[in-house]
Amino acid sequence: MPELPEVETVKRAIASIASGKKITDIFVGRKNLRWPIPTSLNKTLKGVICKQPQRRGKYILIPLSIKQILLIHLGMSGAFRIYKSRPNFQKHDHVAIGFESEEWLVFSDPRRFGCVDLFKEEYVLSHWLLKNLGPEPLSKEFTPDYIITKTASKTCSIKTFLLDQRNIAGIGNIYASEALFRAGISPKRQART
């Protein structure tokens, strides 16, 4: 599963094609991934301009000129491909966006654990997928005091604690394992110790 650094890289690639561009065409290959894809996607996005993409944990957020946000999570196997012109869509291409530049951004997810959502930007802090995310590892809120306070009463393993997105947003199995190895901490150790 892509983790925070990989999702940041994907976000930057999306920005290179989408930022400031008008959407002229939409392709929705299936009606659901992990959850249903909004049925309004096709109708709502045509003619809309994408603003600068953002990232929160493992989520990519694309603000739109209509004061809505397109939210994307890559899941286990999700990826984006960029084309210079309309491609022939493949079996696992679930959502594709065509721009006025004739370029296309195609979201493919063979395992279908990813998600695509569309919501009003005023709900960004209360969206059900975002509202309970903890601070990111490089944010100002992520301090030694934060970790001490959050782990004080946790009886779960430290690795389970690190993987819980409510505690720290963006960390996955690879970075949790690597951090614990480098720190010389057993992943099975209780978080509070």
Where are these regions (language model features)?
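Basic, nucleic-acid-binding surfaces and adjacent catalytic neighborhoods in DNA/RNA-processing proteins
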Residues: K22-L41, Q54, Y59, S65, ...
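A cross-family signal for N-terminal binding/gating loops and helix N-caps
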Residues: M1-G114
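Phosphate/anion-contacting hairpin/loop surfaces
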Residues: L70-A169, Y175-A176, L180-R182
